[in-house]
Amino acid sequence: MAAGSGGSGGSGAGPGPGPGPGGGGGPGSSGPGLGSGGGLGGGGELHPRTGRLVSLSACGRTARRQQPGQEFNHGLVLSREPLRDGRVFTVRIDRKVNSWSGSIEIGVTALDPSVLDFPSSATGLKGGSWVVSGCSVLRDGRSVLEEYGQDLDQLVEGDRVGVERTATGELRLWVNGRDCGVAATGLPARVWAVVDLYGKCTQITVLPSEPGFSPPTPVPTPPLEPLAPPEDSALLEQGTSVDEAFMVSPAQARPETFPNSLDSHNDFASMELSEVVSNAILSAYNGGLLNVSLSSPPAGDGLASSGPATSPILTSNDALLFHEKCGTLIKLSNNNKTAERRRPLDEFNNGVVMTNRPLRDNEMFEIRIDKLVDKWSGSIEIGVTTHNPNSLEYPATMTNLQSGTIMMSGCGILTNGKGTRREYCEFSLDELQEGDHIGLTRKSNSALHFFINGIDQGVATPLTPPVVYGVVDLYGMAVKVTIVHNNNHSDRLRRNNAILRALSPEGALRRAAPAAQAEPERLLFHPNCGQKAAITHEGRTALRPHATDDFNHGVVLSSRALRDGEVFQVRIDKMVDKWAGSIEIGVTTHNPAYLQLPSTMTNLRSGTWMMTGNGVMHNGTTILDEYGHNLDRLKAGDTVGVVRREDGTLHFFVNGMTQGPAAWNVPPGVYAVVDLYGQAAQATIVDDVEVPPVSEPLPEGNNQMSPSSPSSAAGGSDLRFHQLHGSNAVITNGGRTALRHNCRSEFNDAIVISNRALRDGELFEIVIQKMVDRWSGSIEAGVTAIRPEDLEFPNTMTDIDYDTWMLSGTAIMQDGNTMRNNYGCDLDALGTGARIGMMRTAKGDLHYFINGQDQGAACSGLPPGKEVYAVVDLYGQCVQVSITNATGPMDNSLATSNTATEKSFPLHSPVAGVAHRFHSMCGKNVTLEEDGTRAVRVAGYAHGLVFSTKELKAEEVFEVKVEELDEKWAGSLRLGLTTLAPEDMGPGAGSGPGLPPSLPELRTKTTWMVSSCEVRRDGHLQRMNYGRNLERLGVGSRVGIRRCADDTMHILVDGEDMGPAAAGIAKNVWAVLDLYGPVRSVAIVSSTRLEEPEGTQPPSPSSDTGSEVEEDDEVEEQGLRGQNQVGIVPTALEFLENHGKNILLSNGNRTATRVASYNQGIVVISQPLVPHMLVQVRIDFLNRQWTSSLVLGVITCPPERLNFPASACALKRAAWLLRGRGVFHNGLKICEKFGPNLDTCPEGTILGLRLDSSGGLHLHINGVDQGVAVPDVPQPCHALVDLYGQCEQVTIVSPDPGTASGKIAGTQGDMEKADMVDGIKESVCWGPPPAASPLKSCEYHALCSRFQELLLLPEDYFMPPPKRSLCYCESCRKLRGDEAHRRRGEPPREYALPFGWCRFNLRVNPHLEAGTLTKKWHMAYHGSSVAVVRRVLDRGELGAGTTSILSCRPLKGEPGVGFEEPGENCAPPREEQPPPVLLSPSLQYAGAEMLASKVQFRDPKSQRTHQAQVAFQVCVRPGSYTPGPPSAALRELPDQHFSPSELEWVTKEKGATLLYALLVRVE
């Protein structure tokens, strides 16, 4: 046979000479010629007439759709000339966008483009048009074939697609050089190619045919034997007959001989021989091991023969699917390609499915196992049957069928239900896992073959009936399978590797001696990897996609053997915290192509060396125990590597540093292996040139990667943009450049983030390279603590409401809220070439740099020890940025300098936060300095008005310090609140629209002010003799203003609250000051939050959860000490590295996890416990398999050198522990029934320990102090946690600012404070944690809450959530272990807990708290009615009074106490005697219907009618009441626990009661 090599003429087919220069059959050839053509095959250029949005270029060979961001159609192009038969019109996709759905459509049309009226899309072509759209074939716009070929919508840039009209009038589609089969028949003789640049496809280019490749019309092919070269004999081994040997698929013209060298003159110069072989095998495999004839030859050509070898191949394109008729428990989906057994945990059979049509000869029927369950024995069975599914009565299992059925079950073959081959193959179907593939094919010689993961298992039976259907039995463990078609790219790759694994090395690795030294092949991961692993990014990245579901089966190997001295290095990209253990690395002699990969490489017993943890293992046996750095402690961004030296020694690297020789006499030719085990979820190969060797290790620290940082010794930085980004962003230039495509049609969705977390003091700097003037707004930059893998990219980063800090324009935003305006730089004002940098300091401050200049601290308080990533939003005008060379670590002095911090945050600010600023609108004599934190009156005595930059929030304090006085003037500083927005005032000189000269004249909007000791509203006197006289302020005096939640204005002088100055303050008010008279200069000393002094701080919600116990006297003494004493708040608590052997630390040593057994889980806080420091841990996970739970305590011996026992109770020296409800010292119980039972604390509970000033150890639960557990604890001591029994994970949490100090918590009003009586106190004192408490689902609690909301009571009367309420229903009280009665007061008196009620805790005014809420007061209840609840709350006590205890403001309407100026000689009003108040220590009596009337209401949720009662829980001053018998007529005593003579208390004294809680009961 002559093989012609054609030029532009293409390929000729048929006897006789070939046409011109084209290749054809030579004269006298015995068979048809097989040419290899070039050229375009007709219609090489596009017709100049196109759709209205198409522009042509490159001599009519490139077409581009204009305005791709606004339009998705009108992109039709046609070939210039009609197609010639047998020639493929091929185009390459040059560009796609993500804005639309749908993509390129291609086909042919009989319509002449010269006269065609172009429709908007190809589907609108009529009059003889065939178009392939997606995976459907349409004729004149109507679908004629579904599930055809490859889905065109899935093609990417660079893919090639073409159409061909054959000589027989068939339409064929070609995708990337592969024939997809016949798409249509009966085409006219004259058709033009048509391409629609639709949807995502925006640009294509017409391609010439590739050299040496021609897609001819299917031609008869002579028998294989004369063509089989000697080199192919190895491919026909292993029992493969001659007529089963492969032939080249129609997608490739077969070369006359396989090359025996890779010289440049050979057409295969760019391919390795093994690739040629494997592609040829794959082509034959995908073609079903083709018959001798590809189509029926013409009569009389001498090629016809009898038998299967000459039978014509079916040309039907019916997709192989599951038949709609199936087993009774089968559910079909995915267009009948997926079958799933219903109720897999209840039933194990009735799961038979069959194919929708008979199998063709050599057709592969392959399925993938999608889901298995572990309940049953046995698993999937697969085979063929002669029974037609339409007439078959499906059996429970196919092995019950006694005729016409061949099944593979386990590792054997069953024929008609009886075993015919017991050991058919070495694989058992019962051992296959999810993701494995099983296939079968009936060969043309009637032999049946099964395939497992692409590997042919040989002949199962030599004789198979000619008409058989594929059948699958989803039996036992098998639940779900999916049919896999051969056109799936990943399946092709997998099968290719599987076939190569089955081949012998000699057959697959034939190499010719290279003539010259070739460039070394790049190291990649081999595609054959573990079951739970995947290879991405062209073989450079390996990952476990479901890393949180499984911890092993993540083994990956290098694609080739390592050369001597060649370093194989990977970077850890992603880690998870769920598992123990981490990445393992090493080498193996096993070729990855033939290796059956184990679940973990340490299970391999031959030819393997692995570094695991800090040890080295050879063939599964440890050979070095203490070697190098512990791999289990590496973090994301660290690198590990391995190298085999020429002398046979094996060395490992961690972050570029050699760990020394690990093994000797390692043979050459080993493959690198990485085991993505446990926490390691993703790793990427790093070339030697990308990470230079690190010269010397850096000291470890909390904020450094261990043991050294990859970029610390390099001149450049490894910081890049992450591969994950917003939908409109594009990452180029090796990850150093980010741009927003469609920049004139899209302005957002272009967020990019750094590829790793920033280190402390490390600068991330970008340069703006391109901008457009179309939009408003520009680049936004900042940091986020959200990992890129966990970030669901929003439209803009300011949409994220957690763990994110951004600079937008001049505004600093945290979690989407503006924290401050007028920062030192304006990002919206930057242009092309400007550089923006961001850096987190070691102190937790965020600094921005503009063109290298530090702009000062933007915000502080970034979470210590928590990773933050740089994030850039290419928003609005900013289109493109690149990372600069300045990115990397900066000088340490800059990272820790206080100069920039002082500029933005005054050092005397009580709380670190965003400091207040003065608004730029101010009086004409005022100058603002120090970034708006200092105001100076430069002339005169007036025109000194200044405003806050933003509105004051509820309870926010705006405070200034007097810096300069000018004694020649009289008067005082004036301050107050105004509804006038400063930006609404224009510049003026004291009249008209400008600012007035003094604050009393500011009357355009409502203004409240204090001047000297007078309170004025809009200049009118409201009150005299208020607080301290402001005329007496001196240099250093502090004065502040607060808008309270009860709509009152308070003035603070030197931290002391002067009480309410005015009421009825509007919601939106600004602070206003008048630098009048002697006060010349003030400076802001407040932040957006104020740490209040002891005496003025309201009760913290954290202490009002339900505690019934009063603190000791020492707590009150603390409250009388200096007001400036601040509780110590730890900044970076972490667990000590020395811990129990079953402990794994993570999250910067802030999370401890017990990874095995139930003990050996002791951890110690590394920092000593000092007085007033609250150390808290949160219970993250409980394992109900065990009993008991965590143990808390302190130890006074040095923990660094302590050998921890199995449990904390075994500590016999210097240990004080809290376990269950007991207190233990050195293993001996010294107190029982202390506080709540720690064994019953649910997940989410926060437990804390604190030392008071006298050394007493306090236990805190969910922020509530449980009292002194151990007095006089020696110091120094360390907090200890034992993760015992159920408790498997805890995390250190930072305390709330208000509760870090013991004295603060101690002076807060508890809900029900009672004394320690015989060491016993109520166990209800810890409330449910906010997120994980089982009480969250209490229906009774929710019902009572809905009723309380119906009362429409002001929220300010009640404690804020989550300390707002406590439920005493049967289930909730039993869960807490509440006792029915408690004792309280001096002398002690018993009272009953409000069982059956729900308690809503009331606020108590801080001024009255110290004088009234003492441990000497008793607790009682008062039955009430809904009608009087609001009146009682307004008064603040049950008896009539003139002062509201809740607000300390005079009641409205009472004489002599209004805000109007009183007369000079007014006599005080006569007070009325309050009526007697009935109380009871028992709520069963106080809540009786005659004392607490019932009211009917409809539940808004369920619409059911209920009855409800209300009552008050009050504190009663001892001696102010008279006990006696019940006055209400009762049939029997409601509470037998109390004596009848003391069941009712009566008091007439004013101020004898203090409201504590509102109680609600619903029937």
UniProtKB/Swiss-Prot annotation:
Q: Which PROSITE patterns match?
A: NHR
Tagged with keyword Phosphoprotein: yes
Q: Does the keyword Repeat apply?
A: yes
Q: A GO biological process this protein is involved in?
A: mitochondrial DNA repair
Domain (NHR): residue spans on this chain: 43-209, 319-486, 522-688, 718-886, 915-1087, 1132-1295
**Gene this chain is encoded by:** Neurl4
Its name, as the record gives it, is Neuralized-like protein 4
**Function noted in UniProt:** Promotes CCP110 ubiquitination and proteasome-dependent degradation. By counteracting accumulation of CP110, maintains normal centriolar homeostasis and preventing formation of ectopic microtubular organizing centers.
Q: How is it modified after translation?
A: Ubiquitinated; undergoes HERC2-dependent 'Lys-48' ubiquitination. This ubiquitination leads to proteasomal degradation.
Location in the cell: Cytoplasm, Cytoskeleton, Microtubule organizing center, Centrosome, Centriole
SMART domains, per this entry?
NEUZ
Query: Which Pfam families did the record assign?
Result: Neuralized
Q: Where is this region: Disordered?
A: 1-49, 692-717, 1087-1121
- Locate the Phosphoserine modifications and list their residues: 504, 909
Keywords from UniProt, A to Z, are: Cytoplasm, Cytoskeleton, Phosphoprotein, Repeat, Ubl conjugation, Ubl conjugation pathway
Q: Which SUPFAM superfamilies match?
A: Concanavalin A-like lectins/glucanases
| Major location category of this protein | cytoplasm
Composition skew (Gly residues), residue ranges: 1-45
